[in-house]
Amino acid sequence: MISKQEYQAQAAQGYNRIPLVQELLADLDTPLSLYLKLANRPYTYLLESVVGGERFGRYSFIGLPCSHYLKASGKHVDVYQNGEIVEQHDGNPLPFIEAFHNRFKTPEIPSLPRFTGGLVGYFGYETIYNFEHFAHRLKNTTKADPLGTPDILLMLSQELAVVDNLSGKIYLIVYADPSQPDGYERARERLEDIRTQLRQSCAIPLSLGSKHTEAVSEFGEEPFKACVNKIKDYIFAGDCMQVVPSQRMSMEFTDSSLALYRALRTLNPSPYLFYYDFGDFHIVGSSPEILVRRERDDVIVRPIAGTRLRGKTPAEDLANEQDLLSDAKEIAEHVMLIDLGRNDVGRISKTGEVKVTDKMVIEKYSHVMHIVSNVEGRLKDGMTNMDILAATFPAGTLSGAPKVRAMEIIEEVEPSKRGIYGGAVGVWGFNNDMDLAIAIRTAVVKNNTLYVQSGAGVVADSDPASEWQETQNKARAVIHAAQMVQEGLDK
């Protein structure tokens, strides 16, 4: 931990949030047990990672209760402090959010991962109406909104625990405010409070089961198939090459959202595992796909397109993999999305600094396997994170190509707002690094109802029945996890 003198020196350099860090051994705890001890209240989060579906990432992140958060819907933003609105803004929320983020000047913490605090939460799909370079082409008509969640919700994470899964160490981080005369002492006292919480045992909320319920489609199978045929008409007319319609499913769910996270991380480990407690609703997800990642001046997108079910035996698994890589439709769709990714990254990258890596590799998850590629670029000078978001949002894999025309068609054919689905979840650090996943394989739990949404990439030779089945396959992991909880994880 830095000394009072080091703290004062950093304050003199103009930093207005200064991290105090305490390193402890926590090898007898898991990220889940640490979350239960330190967080497990509204406006907290747990972020984990399993690389390539098979290997746990080195770091997990636990957000302690956030006193400040932003909610944006339409052209209005509310800033909350301890549950009370303390600031409001009317107009495009994105410049305001960027300016809010930029209020905080922090020094980097050596030897820790790139994320050590900042904004954490989501940008819902309807954020598209705030990107001025294409919003004028969208109608933004009033649609049914069964979830009623904010378009954007971001927490200001100034107290967190970073778990090093390799060493068994935990790093407790509390940001001090040097504008407060006793800011250093307050932060030290808060760290001691957190250490006290760590020493206590946590009450494990047992999942003993509840009544079994089935998921019901909001769209319906036949209307969805008709939607696929309508999109194919647009494709044959030359309007577009691909569109990704989606359908939402819902089911009664009265169990713990944290139990759902436990089931999902066991059933479908993915590069982005996340649990957000937003008070009146929870987001529980296991996304395989980056929307965009910024590390200093490098930017990465990772299109995923092409899906097969996992085999029941190693031989069947290999056969499904070979079948996927030899499927002309799936390959054509994936190549199209690589090109779209190159175009998106190219808009914000230096000339000649865009490259495709990991071209068309197979990644395997619990229920499905995908074709995956990497597109990387070196940012042009002066690019902001909102420039990056504007260039890459929404993901081509959740909209189609050309992207704007595909979004117009989605707006026409889908019956309700997408909400969080198809948007982005993740972190935007104080250091300006950003790591956002696409909000897929994601449940929203609100008012004793679980919602999950999934889409299918429609191209010229799509079969409506197959596309319907693809949406079922993609939702299967979340629905299965919910039913595992209903059966009881701890019976």
Curated annotation (Swiss-Prot):
A Pfam family this chain is assigned to: Chorismate_bind
Enzyme kind, highest EC tier: lyase
Binding locations of chorismate: 306-307, 421, 441, 455-457
Record keywords, A-Z: Amino-acid biosynthesis, Aromatic amino acid biosynthesis, Lyase, Magnesium, Metal-binding, Tryptophan biosynthesis
Transmembrane feature ranges: none
Binding site for Mg(2+): 333, 470
Biological pathway: Amino-acid biosynthesis; L-tryptophan biosynthesis; L-tryptophan from chorismate: step 1/5
Keyword Cell wall biogenesis/degradation recorded: no
Catalytic activity: chorismate + L-glutamine = anthranilate + pyruvate + L-glutamate + H(+)
EC number assigned by the record: 4.1.3.27
Functional description taken from the UniProt entry: Part of a heterotetrameric complex that catalyzes the two-step biosynthesis of anthranilate, an intermediate in the biosynthesis of L-tryptophan. In the first step, the glutamine-binding beta subunit (TrpG) of anthranilate synthase (AS) provides the glutamine amidotransferase activity which generates ammonia as a substrate that, along with chorismate, is used in the second step, catalyzed by the large alpha subunit of AS (TrpE) to produce anthranilate. In the absence of TrpG, TrpE can synthesize anthranilate directly from chorismate and high concentrations of ammonia.
PANTHER family on file: AMINOBENZOATE/ANTHRANILATE SYNTHASE, ISOCHORISMATE SYNTHASE MENF
Protein name per the record: Anthranilate synthase component 1
Gene: trpE
